[in-house]
Structure formats: structure tokens, C-alpha cells
Amino acid sequence: MSVQSPLIAVPRKTTTDVDWATPIRHVIAASYGEDPNSYAEECAVLQRCRQDAVRGAGNDQTARDLLYKYFGQLELLELRFAEIKVSFPWNDAFTDKLTTQTSLAFEKASIIHLISSILSSLAQSASRSDPEGLKRAYYNPRATAGMLTYINENFLHAPSTDLSREVVHLLIGIMMAQAAEIFTEKLVEEKKSASLVARSANQTASMYTSVVDEMKEFQGKGVFDRNWLYVLQIKAKLFGSLTQYYKATSDSAAGKHGTALVRLKIANSLIQDAQKQASSFIYTFVAASTPSLPHDAANALNEIVKAHATVCGEAKEQAVKDNDLIYHEVLPSEASLPAIEKLPPAAPITIQDVYGNQEVTKLIGPDIFLRLVPLAVHESASVYSEEKAKLVRAEVDKVELAEGEIQAGLDHLNLPEEIDRWRQFLEGDTNDDVPLSQQLKSLVDSVGDVRQVENDLGRLDGERGACERELRELNGALDAESRECERMRAKYTPNFTQSPSGPQTANLRSNLSANLSALSSASTSDAHLQSLWQSIQPSISLLSSGPSNLERAARDITEGNSQKIDKTVSLLDLDDEEVDRKALGQEEKDALRKAVDDGREKLDRLKKIRAERDEVLRDLKEKIQTDDVSNLLLLNRRSQNVEPQLFASELEKFRPYQTRLAAAVSASRSILQELDMLVAQVHKGTGFREILRKEKDRQRIIRDWEKRLIEAGESYAEIRAGLGKGLSYYDSLRRVIEDLRMEVQRFTNSREQERRNMVSDIETRQRLGGTSPSTGGVVANRGLEERLAALKMEAPPQPPRLGTTSTPNLPPPPGRGSSNVTSSYLPPPPPPKPQSNPYDFSTLAGFGSFATPSVSSPQHVYPSQPQQAYNQQSYIPPQQNPYYPPPPSRPTYASPPFAPQQPPMQSGHSPYAPPPGHAPQPQQPQYPSSQNQQQRQGYEYPGYGQQGGYGGGYGQY
């Protein structure tokens, strides 16, 4: 067909610029709580996008693409700003009336109407003579109909005429009729069967007839151009004629010549009417007044009608002649002719199909306000992220479980070391190196120099002996002071009134005895350390010799020379230690060689599978990390209960990764089973079993030897810890002894000064009184002095000598003999105390400068009347003497317990000097009672027995 049939295009709506920025900024500030200024660029992009779409382009593909983009952004914009109010002015496409609304739906409907106008214009201008133009001409009317259908289905209340349901429905009918027309033209052009062309033409004629009937209802309303009606009427009659013509051709071919002749007459009648209308349309059509039609619409339509009229006329005349001369068939009436079937019309292309195209998606581009995500979308995205995290955790758990099974299986089979050992058996590699455990190697590095331990053991003995000597010296000083006091009392009785020192030194003596008992326990701990060191010294010397000597010793043991290293290793265990490498037969060697090759191949394959599995897991994690469904959630925001289906469909993207991971896990387990079977098969060989037995014996001996060395190392660590505690204990005991020494010195010096003053006062009074001791008194005094010289002061039970388990005994006073004479005024010895912990000094927590007792020391008041004679004086025990109050209960102090308390001193004279006219009333320094001492075994720091420190000592193993 040389002339192209004219098509009708939908008129275009027009508009002016709008302000997007101000309403969007207001919504961002009010609803999202963000800074609107940060979205100024997005607002400008949206503003420019609208201007380009509605004003910057014509009726070409560029205009269509810009409109596609703008409408897509409107869809995304509505998801975030559904209630935004912007004034959108649009002029009606048919009446040119201005309509302004603030609804975003009005803007969307107007843009869709404008898109349909552009699509219909593209269909109108497409050249149908080439295949590509024909495709566009057939596609665009259907896409236009789909766009208009979307308007009718989604925008119910039209604010303008061009968006009303009746007008839009009429436009849809015109577009679909034109699409059917183009399809019929294609069938005619391709010379398809006459019956098929007749059916398609009948459908086209029916659609045009329906549109003509609808348009007649708008007559006189000034909506549609009257030229549209002329074109539609002409096309309705044209395609009706085409229907009858091609059906007649089909009937004639079928031998129905009478029916064919009747149909040709009908076709000729219809085309004659169409020709009359087309001829008049040429004179009434003005192209400038109807821009929706091509400028040559009248001429083109007239040419098409005229050409078909000529064909119909010739065909009718020929059919009449043939029937009159040849067929002589009776012509049926028109009413009796069978109805012609209609070809089903093509469906409109929906807007979803248009925007589902990848090219259109690329045109839309990313969301302009991508950074602005509603809270509901954030919440849904968080739920999806948790679903992804569950998926990843499940796959990671499966992979970790599979890896653990593989590692446990390889460790159980001792692979790949077992295969290397098989290779050594085959190659006769007699490597005598004995691998040492990592624990033993670490122990070698930690032993260090053993000479320091021997030096510290020597220091312990020296410190213990020095402490014992000093404590006994302090006991001796107290004994000497007590003897001197009693000697003066016997000499100057009854005028010598100095109180006995026994009650005053009870606590000091108790402290000294407790320290000696503690030294006895410390001696036991020291002896235990010494014994333990002697038992492990050879092993520790070997460990300290370095890794090379240790490996040499291990080789000596495996070679049967254990007497050089460890006498506890039985030579009977090493009789068969030298493995006979030639115990395998040739058949077993061949089988073992094949097993080595198979094992290596399977291990290599297992390594590749593990690497591939880990790579797939990394890819899965990266894929899940970068996966974002916020846009999909935003698009489906208005849908109800869509999240489960959406999440399920999105998670299906990761199904291939899960499948690959499952396959890798299954393959690794299969290979592990094959390796297990391979090792079991190799171990079944008789010669190999013998080799394994000897190797196991060899390994057992080495492990036992290593175990003994490790136990020696643990004992060595205990010795070093005990030495540290013991030396710290003796250092602390030294400080306590020094405090006791100072207290004893203060006490003895004070007592000596008091005696001097008292003796001087007695001698002065005797000289002034002119009296002298009587001869009998002198004789009596001499006898008493002789008895006192032989007097042996009763001391508390002595602790045993160091190295024994009993309490050491204090030495007798130097220079005095033993005597059974006891003075009636001497206090009874303190009750024996249980063996004390040498490190627990909590019993002396209230002495000296370390702490102040919680109760003040009471002063002992003596009567002022003359004292009884020495041989008439009776001793009152401390618990019955009213001048000696009971000792206060021992408080708990944080200070060192054995530091004695210094008695109060007065400047200028002795605290024990009596006031004038009175007998001396010395202030007795009081010491806390040690009745409730808690005893422990081992070393403890003095003063720390109850407040931390080292507690029960190092000596308890």
C-alpha cells in the first residue's frame, strides 16, 4: 500500500512551572525531623526533572523518556510525601480549560495523559513501510490504551474533561481500533489467507463502529474535533467493505459463488459510501485546525478508499459474469448470509509492563530522595536484615560443624603425618629425631639457671639459724634482768620494792616462744623443700641444659641408653625399639605405595573443597551485606501483609550459595570416610601392624619420660614459689625480731635504771639514818643470796631444736647452775601453747609501734605501807592478784603481730620511780594476751595471717 492510513493522536495537556522545594522542605522538617537544607539539591533535581518532562521536549522519543523518568520519580516521591500539597496547574487537552489542584494524584494522572499523547503521536508518525516502524506503530497505540486504562482504573473523580471516564474510554477505543487496523494492514501486506484477513478486518470495522457510536454522544458538546468523526466513519465503512471483500474471496475459493457475489455487492456498496464521505472530507479538512491528525489525512484516506473501490467494482463485475455464464447459482439474501467471525483483538500494554522494561527502569534512575527513608521502611528493613542474619548464621554453623568434623577426623587418623610415615617406611628413612611436645619445649625455656635455687636453699638455712640465735639471746636478756632484780631484792630486803619482772615479761616470753615454735614449723617446710629439690635435681639439670641436650637425651632413650638419662626407664621396653624397616613384604609395599598416592590425592581434593567452601561462604556474606530491599519495601509500602512473601522471594537469591555450601559439606564428609577406610585397610597388614606396635611402644616410652620431666618441672615451680615465700617470711621475721629486741632493751634498761635509783635511795636513807644491816640480817641475806645464785628461773616450755617436731628449749641462764629452789613470788609459767604457724603473727597484732591496743594498759598500784620481808612475802598469781587486771582480749590488727608495745615514758625520770613518801608504783607495760592464737602450718608473712598474704604457706604439698 503506497499511501499510509492516517491515525488519530491524543491531544496534549499543557501546564506551567510549580514550586516543589517549599512543600518538600516543610514535610522534611515536620515529618522526618531532619534539616531541609541538606535536601536542597534533591529538590532542585526534582524541579528540573518536571520542567524537562512537560515543557522541554516535543512529540519524540526524548519527550517520552523524560516523561517516563518524571512519572517514575513521582511514584517514589509519593511513597515519602503522600500528603504533600503542591499547586499543579493543567490545561484541558480538549477544552483548554485551566484546572489547578494540590493532589499528587492529579499530577500523576496528567503526566500519564501526557505520556499517552506522546505515544499516540509516535504511532502516528511511525513509517509502517519498514518492519521497525511497523512494530512501533503497533506497540504505541496499545501502550497508549494501557496508560489511559490506568487513569480510568485509579483516578475515579476526574477534575477535567480530558480525564473523565467517558472521554478516556473513547480514547482507549480509538487506540485499540487503530492497533487492530495496523494489524489488518500487516496481514494484507503479507498476503495472509482471505478468511484470516476477513476476520481481522471484521474486528477492526466493529471497533470503529463502536467508537463512532460513542462519539455521536459528544456531538454539540465541543469536546472532540468533528474531523475525528469523519475519519472514524470512513474507516468503519472501509474495513466493513474489506471484511466482505475478503470473505467473498474465501467463499469463491470454496465454491460458494453465489454467496461470494452477494458479499462483493455489499463490499462495493460500503466502499461507495466511504468514497463519497472521503471526497467531501477533502474539502472540509483543514490541517492547521486539527493538529491531532496528519496534515495529509484527507488525501491519504481518499486515496485508500478510491483504490479499494476500484478493486471491489472490478471483482463484482467479474463475479457477475462468471455466475451468469458459468455457475448460475441463486443469490441468497443479505440477511441470510452467515455472520463473519471476528479475530480476538490484541490486549492493551499496561503501565506495569511498560515500567517493567529494563530500559525504562534505567531511564528512571535512582530515587532522588534515596537518603530519606521512612521509619516504617527502616523497621521492615531491620526485620529483613535479621532474616538474612539468621540465614548466614545457619550456614556458618553448618560450615563450622563440618570443619570441626574434618579436623577431628584428620586428628583421629593422624593425617597427613600418617601418610608421611608410610612414605618413610617405603623409603627406609630412619630419622632418629624424636619430636618433643610443645609443653616440654616451653618448660625448657622457663627453667632457667638452677644455681639460683641452690643459693636460695642455702639462704633459707642461714636465715633460720640467725633468727633462732637472736630469739634465744632475747630470752637470755630477760632471764638476766629477772635474776638481777631478785638479787637486789634479797640484798636490800625489805626496803627494795621493785616489782618482780615475771608478770611484766610474760607476754614477751610468750611471743619469743611462739616465734621459736614457728621456726620449728618453718624448719619442717625448709626440709621438705630440700628433699624435693634433691629428688628432682637431675631432671631439672637436664631441662636447664637446653633443647639440643634434651633431644639428645630423648634419642638415647629410644636407642636403649636410658641408663645415661633416666634410670626409671626399663630396658625391657626397648628390646625391640629398633624397628625393622624391611619387615614389609613386596606385596605390602606395593599396597602401601598405592595407599600413599591415594591418600595424598584425597587430601589434596579435601583441601580444595574446603577452600572452595570457604570462598562460597565469603561470597554469601558479601552478597547479603550488600543486599538492600529498602527500595522494594518502599514500593510495596501500601500493600498489606506483603513482607513475608517479599522476604521469601528476596531470600531465594541466596539459594544457589546455600546449595553449593551443602554440596561442599557433603563432599568433604565423603572424602573423610574414604580416608578412614584407607587408613583402616593399611593398618590391617601383618607387617605394618608389627611396625605400628613397635612405634607405639617407642612413643609410649618417650611420653612417659616427658611426663616425668613435666612433673619435675611442676615441682620445680613449686620449689621456686616456696623459696620466694620462705625468704619473704624470714625477712619479715627479721623485722619483727628487731622490734622485739628494741622492746626488750627498753624494758631491761628501764628496769636497770629503776633499780639503780632505788638502791641509791636505800643506801642514802641508811647512811642518813646511821643504821646498818644487822649481823643476823647480813648472814640471812648472804644465805638468801647464795640460794638465789643457784636459783633457776622457771621458763615457759621451750620449743624443740630446729629440725625436730617439738618446741625448742631455751638455754639455761649463762653462768648459773641448776637449782630446785623457786621463789614464792615468781609467777607460774604460762600454759603451754599449741604449735604455732611460723608465718602466722596475728597473735601479736597489738604490739609496739605497729598499732595501738584497743584498750589502755592499766597501771599497777602498789600499797604505800612497808613491804613484808622476803621470807614472809607470799606470791599472788596474776589471776588472783587484784593489782593485775586480766589481760584484755586480743583485737585484730593489720599491723605485724610480734612488734611489742613501747611503755609510756616521762621526760626527765624513769617511769618506774616512786613519788616521794611512797613505795615505788611502776607502770607496768601491758601486752595483749596470746591465749586465742590461731596456729597454722607452713610459712606466712608476719602480720598477714588474717589479711591476705600467702596464707597457709608453701610447705604443704
UniProtKB/Swiss-Prot annotation:
Q: Does the record's keyword annotation contain Cytoplasm? A: yes
Which stretches of sequence are listed as region Disordered?
Answer: 751-779, 795-957
Keywords assigned by UniProt, alphabetized: Coiled coil, Cytoplasm, Endosome, Protein transport, Transport
Biased segments, Low complexity type: 926-944
Q: What's the superkingdom here?
A: Eukaryota
Coiled coil segments of this chain: 449-493, 585-626
One GO process term, biological-process aspect: protein transport to vacuole involved in ubiquitin-dependent protein catabolic process via the multivesicular body sorting pathway
Where in the sequence does UniProt note compositional bias of the Polar residues kind?
851-871
Q: Which InterPro entries match?
A: ALIX_V_dom, BRO1_dom, BRO1_sf
Q: Which residues form the BRO1 domain?
A: 6-406
Location relative to the cell: Cytoplasm; Endosome
Feature: compositional bias, Basic and acidic residues: 751-766
Skewed-composition ranges (Gly residues) = 945-957
This chain's protein is named: Vacuolar protein-sorting protein BRO1
Q: Where is the composition biased (Pro residues)?
A: 826-835, 879-890, 912-925
Q: Which family does it belong to?
A: Belongs to the BRO1 family.
Tell me the Pfam families matching this sequence: ALIX_LYPXL_bnd (PF13949), BRO1 (PF03097)
Outline what the protein does.
Answer: Involved in concentration and sorting of cargo proteins of the multivesicular body (MVB) for incorporation into intralumenal vesicles.
UniProt GO cellular component terms: endosome
